């Protein structure tokens, strides 16, 4: 479809409502205004007018707003018709507009895509629109607004600018090798490179927290039957989400709860007790449990404190630990402290976190909540923070890898050409975040996930 067509779509959710909005963008927006309104409204002023059908009869009446390009959201001429929110009325008005020559229904996200293509916002800001709509907490919404206002993009532009200056310096050293000063070995380039690498690492840290706010942390509760996994799920969820009995193997399928801890979204997953299955249904449940464990951001290894005094995971259940992915973070949760009399608290044991609590009474649950926040580097202070997507994290990781490789070339061989190439690749990876170097396929995937009227 052509990006020069004039597009129209409903900008409010489908269904009944007090107000329904149709948005038109493109060179024929003024023609739509003359046909439906009988006049072109004064730019950026609200005008209360009847909306006319082709025969002159009134379909509805409401507010019309006209924004001539480039001073509009999309950078094109934009007309918004704000009428009553009945689906029949909106459908009649939409059909009236589509009957005009050169008009078509907008693709999902096409208004935002045109804003991007017309340099009204960059790709990270465009994605922030969708993230703001989908925000599941106040902090996620505030961070999405920061991204929309350019907080994330500004950090990326600073890094790109620093890399540009560094590339100029490196390439000058390559082009003028006969100068008395060896620019590659005098330490100045390495100092600048180290500074950029440190700044990039700080942005990566903030982006990881932004991704956490957007997507949530996946925490899987795993362990033997009757260790208290479902009781812990209920305690974290604050409700009876799972059935709890003294019968081993009560939980046979995966149970999911979505909760927030101080604005941080968590996906808590309760799984079937791990043991040799007694029947086919239990076997399937245990297989699903392992699938969830392998995809987790963190595992809460639930231990019945009345059955063992051990605190090291390998000593508690070596076969379980042997099957876990080596890089998967684990927190050992010694449950039933109300029975064993153990002191509630969090400690570190040989690189693993250990927490003593009682899922039945709720004692120690607040300690676990704080631990989950801290383990993911989450802080309650997100003022100035931004949201990030997985593609952003991947681009930042790629850029960091190129800078590390460039640093190795510099300190080991003073290989200016190789360093310059690594700097260029790092710069390109960063520019993909804001859309300065992005394939049409990537843009299509991003904007297709938006609402129709966005």
Curated annotation (Swiss-Prot):
GO BP terms, alphabetized: tRNA methylation; tRNA wobble uridine modification
CDD domains cross-referenced by the UniProt entry: trmE (cd04164), TrmE_N (cd14858)
Annotated InterPro entries: G_TrmE, GTP-bd, GTP-bd_TrmE_N, GTPase_MnmE, MnmE_dom2, MnmE_helical, P-loop_NTPase, Small_GTP-bd
Keywords assigned: Cytoplasm, GTP-binding, Hydrolase, Magnesium, Metal-binding, Nucleotide-binding, Potassium, tRNA processing
A Pfam family hit: MnmE_helical
Record: residues binding Mg(2+): 230, 251
Residues that bind GTP: 226-231, 245-251, 270-273, 335-338, 358-360
Subcellular location(s) per record: Cytoplasm
MF-aspect GO terms: GTP binding; GTPase activity; metal ion binding
Domain TrmE-type G, first and last residues per copy: 216-377
Signal peptide boundaries: none
Gene3D superfamilies, per database record: P-loop containing nucleotide triphosphate hydrolases (3.40.50.300), Probable tRNA modification gtpase trme, domain 1 (3.30.1360.120), tRNA modification GTPase MnmE domain 2 (1.20.120.430)
Residues annotated as binding K(+): 226, 245, 247, 250
Cofactor note: Binds 1 potassium ion per subunit.
EC id: 3.6.-.-
Record's GO cellular component terms: cytosol
Major localization listed first in the record, in broad terms: cytoplasm
PANTHER family given in the database record: TRNA MODIFICATION GTPASE GTPBP3, TRNA MODIFICATION GTPASE GTPBP3, MITOCHONDRIAL
Family: Belongs to the TRAFAC class TrmE-Era-EngA-EngB-Septin-like GTPase superfamily. TrmE GTPase family.
Entry function: Exhibits a very high intrinsic GTPase hydrolysis rate. Involved in the addition of a carboxymethylaminomethyl (cmnm) group at the wobble position (U34) of certain tRNAs, forming tRNA-cmnm(5)s(2)U34.
Subunit structure: Homodimer. Heterotetramer of two MnmE and two MnmG subunits.
HAMAP family: GTPase_MnmE
The name this protein goes by in its record: tRNA modification GTPase MnmE
Annotated source species: Yersinia pseudotuberculosis serotype O:3 (strain YPIII)
Recorded name of the encoding gene: mnmE
């Amino acid at each position: 479809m052509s990006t020069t067509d004039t597009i129209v779509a409903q900008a409010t959710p489908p269904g009944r409502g007090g107000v329904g909005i149709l948005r038109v963008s493109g060179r024929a927006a003024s023609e739509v205004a003359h046909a439906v309104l009988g006049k072109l409204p004064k730019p950026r002023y609200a005008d209360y007018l009847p909306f006319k059908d082709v025969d002159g009869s009134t379909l509805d009446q409401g507010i019309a707003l006209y924004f001539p390009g480039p001073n509009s959201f999309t950078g094109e001429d934009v007309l918004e018709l704000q009428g009553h929110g009945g689906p029949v009325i909106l459908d009649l008005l939409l059909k009236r507009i589509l009957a005009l020559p050169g008009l078509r229904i907008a693709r999902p996200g096409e208004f935002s895509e045109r804003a991007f293509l017309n340099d009204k916002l960059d790709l990270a800001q465009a994605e922030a629109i969708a993230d703001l709509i989908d925000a599941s907490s106040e902090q996620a919404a505030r961070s999405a607004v920061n991204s929309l206002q350019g907080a994330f993009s500004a950090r990326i532009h600073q890094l790109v600018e620093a890399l540009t200056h560094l590339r100029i310096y490196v390439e000058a050293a390559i082009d003028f090798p006969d100068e008395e000063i060896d620019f590659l070995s005098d330490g100045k380039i390495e100092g600048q490179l180290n500074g950029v690498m440190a700044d990039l690492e700080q942005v990566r840290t903030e982006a990881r927290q932004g991704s956490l706010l957007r997507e949530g942390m996946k925490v899987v509760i795993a362990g033997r039957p009757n260790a208290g996994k479902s009781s812990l799920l209920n305690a974290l969820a604050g409700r009876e989400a799972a059935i709890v009995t003294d019968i081993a193997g009560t939980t046979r399928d995966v149970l999911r709860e979505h909760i927030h801890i101080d604005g941080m979204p968590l996906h808590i997953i309760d799984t079937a007790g791990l043991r040799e299955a007694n029947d086919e249904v239990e076997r399937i449940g245990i297989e699903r449990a392992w699938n969830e464990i392998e995809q987790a951001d963190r595992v809460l290894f639930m231990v019945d404190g009345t059955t063992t005094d051990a605190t090291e995971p390998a000593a508690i259940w070596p076969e379980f630990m042997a099957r876990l992915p080596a890089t998967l973070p684990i927190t050992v949760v010694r449950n039933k402290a109300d029975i064993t009399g153990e002191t509630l608290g969090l400690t570190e044991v040989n690189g693993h976190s250990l927490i003593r609590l009682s899922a039945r009474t709720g004692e120690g649950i607040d300690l676990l909540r704080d631990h989950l926040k801290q383990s993911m580097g989450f802080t309650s202070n997100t003022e100035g923070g931004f949201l990030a997507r997985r593609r952003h994290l991947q681009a930042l990781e790629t850029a960091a890898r190129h800078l590390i490789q460039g640093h190795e070339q510099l300190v080991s061989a003073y290989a200016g050409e190789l360093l310059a190439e690594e700097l260029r690749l790092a710069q390109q990876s960063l520019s993909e975040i804001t859309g300065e170097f992005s394939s049409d396929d990537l843009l299509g995937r991003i904007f297709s996930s938006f609402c129709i009227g966005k």
